[in-house]
Swiss-Prot record:
Enzyme Commission number(s) of this protein: 6.2.1.41
CDD domains, A to Z: FadD3
Protein name (Swiss-Prot/TrEMBL): 3-[(3aS,4S,7aS)-7a-methyl-1,5-dioxo-octahydro-1H-inden-4-yl]propanoyl:CoA ligase
Gene3D superfamilies: 3.30.300.30, N-terminal domain of ligase-like (3.40.50.12780)
Catalysis performed (reactions): 3-[(3aS,4S,7aS)-7a-methyl-1,5-dioxo-octahydro-1H-inden-4-yl]propanoate + ATP + CoA = 3-[(3aS,4S,7aS)-7a-methyl-1,5-dioxo-octahydro-1H-inden-4-yl]propanoyl-CoA + AMP + diphosphate; 5-hydroxy-3-[(3aS,4S,5R,7aS)-7a-methyl-1,5-dioxo-octahydro-1H-inden-4-yl]propanoate + ATP + CoA = 3-[(3aS,4S,5R,7aS)-5-hydroxy-7a-methyl-1-oxo-octahydro-1H-inden-4-yl]propanoyl-CoA + AMP + diphosphate
Role description: Involved in the catabolism of the rings C and D of cholesterol. Catalyzes the ATP-dependent CoA thioesterification of 3aalpha-H-4alpha(3'-propanoate)-7abeta-methylhexahydro-1,5-indanedione (HIP) to yield HIP-CoA. It can also use the hydroxylated analogs of HIP, 5alpha-OH HIP and 1beta-OH HIP. It requires that the side chain at C17 is completely removed.
GO molecular function, one term: ATP binding
Lineage: Bacteria, Bacillati, Actinomycetota, Actinomycetes, Mycobacteriales
Annotated residues for binding of ATP: T177, S178, G179, T180, T181, G182, R183, S184, K185, D391, R406, K497
Broad class of enzyme this protein falls into: ligase
InterPro entries: AMP-bd_C, AMP-bd_C_sf, AMP-binding_CS, AMP-dep_synth/lig_dom, ANL_N_sf
Protein's UniProt keywords contain Transmembrane helix: no
Organism annotation: Mycobacterium tuberculosis (strain ATCC 25618 / H37Rv)
GO biological process: cholesterol metabolic process
């Protein structure tokens, strides 16, 4: 019997007790009631235990939004382990680095997906801790999921005990977020934090078991995992995963499933609004949308309300180190407030603006710390418990936060954080590049995209196409610069550091 309800296994147990026959999950090829979802989770958890996964182990998922992701994630928690989501856009090199540092013994990886075979692309020799790879079928019947489940037939009895032993303070997940030095950091969050933050997010949107939630946001991101899977788990809302965003497919899904909840970055709504077939679909069921992660024009919020007929449109601000949360607008806020601010603190957060303008957050949902990096943890969370976000902002008289700049030069491309230092390190290794710097520039569809400024060595014949092609080989697509400017020298300040403001002036 699970007594403490502040764990993911407890949340699923409660859902089954309260809504046993309620539709919990709808995928392209399968539907799950709450009870059927619990049974599938127990089967996968038993298989993990049979494969030798121990409590506090870290198990990774490198796959898109299918029902397998949901089941695998919850199964990892039931086995007492922590889930490590990997961005599906990562290259094999990027994924290998994270898997190595996490010491993951098991990986759920997509088979053929968008022209790449992630499971086959890994260098297993570089990952001695990785004992098992479970292939998740996405575009082809090339998975090993059924074989994986079969291995757990003799371990089902062990699952309940494992699940009951999970404590609220145990680490539930490790999401990796790029750092200003260019190397990713693993953010440790506990069960109580992940559940508390996602429950607060759902409460702001008044989400209930009557809602149907189309999850376009990727599960490897807090917006899809905590504001998606865990929010539905705690409210009973029906989760409908969307594998890859396509405006027409999304419009069909909204009409077919009578979708009420549709979060996503601004580009999602812009694509739906601009689609020539939009008026052919009944979108009247839409009720609640949350956007952010980029500049949001007032006119977009107004069009979402008037043309998509969404009752509640909110914006929010958060970061991985705060469980993806921080501030959020409220249903009663007007379109201007929603578009021009990030709202007020929620999820038990306190907000303060430091003397230098940096946004600080404090509360029980600030991360446990960074994986194997006490120095970085101490730098991020001060002695008084304030999380230093690296963002510059201001608070208006109503308490709404407005982000005005980023201390760390990070920009957001299509909802994904990009740290220039990581891209710059890749460019520095390219033959013919003497110096390089990267900034984010506005883009109508993606919010911001990268622009590289390159100092080429004489006689190398570098051009824009070759630089972009090189970075695409080594980085995820959203990190790849979309344009290149060649300059004789990079502008630097008195301390010898590249002056990003001057680069922005150069365009």
């Amino acid at each position: 019997m699970i007594n403490d309800l502040r764990t993911v296994p407890a949340a699923l147990d409660r859902l089954v007790r309260q809504l046993p026959d309620h539709t919990a999950l709808i995928a392209e090829d399968r539907r799950f009631t709450s009870t059927e979802l619990r049974d599938a989770v127990y089967g996968a958890a038993a298989a993990l235990i049979a494969l030798g996964v121990e409590p506090a182990d870290r198990v990774a998922i490198w796959s898109p939004n299918t029902w397998h992701w949901v089941v695998a994630c919850l199964a990892i928690h039931h086995a007492g382990a922590a889930v490590v989501p990997l961005n599906t856009r990562y290259t094999a090199t990027e994924a290998t680095d994270i898997l190595d540092r996490a010491g993951a013994p098991v990986l759920f990886a997509a088979g053929l997906f968008l022209g790449a075979d992630r499971a086959a692309g890994l260098d297993r020799a570089a990952l001695p801790a990785l004992r098992h790879v479970v292939r998740v079928p996405v575009e082809a019947d090339d998975g090993t999921w059924d074989e994986f489940i079969a291995t757990g037939a003799g371990a089902l009895d062990a699952v309940a005990a494992r699940a009951a032993a999970v404590a609220p303070q145990d680490v539930s997940d490790i999401l990796f977020t790029s750092g200003t030095t260019g190397r990713s950091k693993g953010v440790l969050c506990a069960h109580r934090q992940s559940l508390s933050a996602s429950a607060s997010w759902a409460a702001n949107g008044k989400i209930t078991s009557d809602d149907r939630y189309l999850c376009i946001n990727p599960f490897f991101h807090n917006f899809g995992y905590k504001a998606g899977i865990l929010a539905c788990l705690q409210t009973g809302a029906t989760l409908i995963p969307h594998v890859t965003f396509d405006p027409l497919h999304a419009l069909r899904a909204i009409e077919r499933h009578r979708i009420t909840v549709l979060p996503g970055p601004p580009t999602i709504y812009q694509s739906l609004l601009d689609h020539p077939a939009r008026k052919d679909f009944d979108l009247s069921s839409l009720r609640f949308a949350v956007t952010g992660a980029a500049t949001v024009p007032v006119v977009l919020v107004e069009r979402m309300q008037s043309e998509l007929d969404i009752d509640i449109v909110l914006t929010a601000y958060g970061l991985t180190e705060a469980n993806g949360m921080g501030t959020m607008c409220r249903p009663e806020d007007d379109a201007v407030t929603v578009a021009t601010t990030c709202g007020r603190p929620f999820a038990d957060f306190e907000l303060r603006i430091a003397d230098d303008g940096e946004v600080l957050l404090r509360g029980p949902n600030v991360m446990v710390g960074y994986l194997d990096d006490t120095e970085a943890t101490a730098a991020a969370i001060d002695a008084d418990g304030w999380l230093h976000t690296g963002d510059i902002g201001a608070v208006d008289q109503a308490g709404n936060l407005r982000i005005t700049d980023r201390l760390k030069d990070m920009y957001i491309c299509g909802g994904f954080n990009v740290y220039p230092a990581e891209v710059e390190q890749v460019l520095a290794r390219m033959d013919g590049v003497a110096d390089a710097a990267v900034i984010g520039v506005p883009d109508q569809r993606l919010g911001e995209v990268g622009r590289a400024f390159v100092v080429a060595r004489p006689g190398t014949g570098l051009d824009e196409a070759s630089v972009i092609a090189y970075t695409r080989e080594h980085l995820a697509n959203f990190k790849t610069p979309r344009s290149v400017r060649f300059v004789d020298v990079l502008p630097r300040n008195a301390a010898g550091k590249v002056s990003k403001p001057q680069l922005r002036e150069l365009g």
